[in-house]
A protein has these predicted regions:
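Structural recognition of the beta-strand scaffold that forms the well-ordered cores
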Residues: 29-31, 82-87, 112-113
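Intrinsically disordered, low-complexity Ser/Thr-rich linker and spacer segments
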Residues: 194-198
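Long, amphipathic alpha-helical surface segments
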Residues: 1-19, 25-27, 34, 38, ...
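Catalytic phosphate/metal-binding cores of nucleic-acid and nucleotide-processing enzymes, i.e., regions
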Residues: 173
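Active-site nucleophile-His-acid catalytic modules used for acyl/amide transfer and hydrolysis
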Residues: 55, 59-96
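Regulatory/sensor and coupling segments of signal-transduction and defense proteins
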Residues: 176
Length: 198
């Protein structure tokens, strides 16, 4: 996912507040979900928070990458972004909370991590719709569902390239004739629906 899109998605989930408030977990929060140095009377503005936000996300991504490498994971860009969003929301944590708990200090497989992400949907012990949506997005990102599609590495793929790709990824048996007819459209549509709606 493009870095700007990634930043914007986290901001969308966090929202923006100029005055300090208590999050569902009871922690004083401000801006785009910042908790460091925030007290009941804290006030901020977008300019200050934009600078903090980008610096913090970049620093956090490096920390997540380093820790996951230490645990022996070889993450894709999308997996790293998903885990960075997760850590931004829940912290790096330890064996009892946050990202470290999610990966079980490196003991979980990539598949197990993917399965566990949606379970972290509570704030103050209550399931929150915003966290359900965020975890679903993080899981999809972690699973690579937002990867940019390339067909045979070509910038201008042909109809035959599309048919070959659809056959490969979906197990379809399209005739490779270069004609985008009803069968090609249906097979492509069905595959897209399966990927994004399971």
């Amino acid at each position: 996912m493009d870095k700007t899109d990634f930043y914007n998605k986290i901001k969308e989930f966090e929202g923006f507040k100029t005055h300090a408030y208590k999050c569902p977990a009871g922690v004083w929060t401000i801006g785009y979900g910042r908790t460091a140095g925030v007290t009941s009377g804290s006030v901020t503005n977008r300019e200050a928070e934009e600078s903090w936000f980008q610096n913090y996300v970049n620093s956090l991504m490096k920390e997540v990458s380093q820790r996951m490498t230490e645990y022996g994971y070889d993450l894709t860009e999308y997996q790293l972004q998903a885990l960075t969003s997760f850590a931004y929301n829940l912290g790096m944590g330890n064996k009892n909370k946050g990202l470290i708990q999610l990966v079980k200090s490196g003991e979980r497989t990539i598949e197990e991590i993917s399965e566990k992400i949606p379970e972290y949907n509570k704030g103050g012990g209550v399931v929150l719709a915003g966290l359900v949506r965020r975890r679903a997005w993080e899981k999809d990102l972690f699973d690579g569902k937002f990867e940019k599609a390339t067909i045979s590495g070509k910038s201008n793929p042909t109809a035959k390239d599309l048919q070959l790709l659809v056959n490969e990824v979906s197990g379809s048996d399209l005739v490779i004739d270069g004609k985008i007819g009803k069968k090609t459209i249906t097979a492509t549509y069905n595959y897209i629906m399966e990927v994004f709606h399971g």
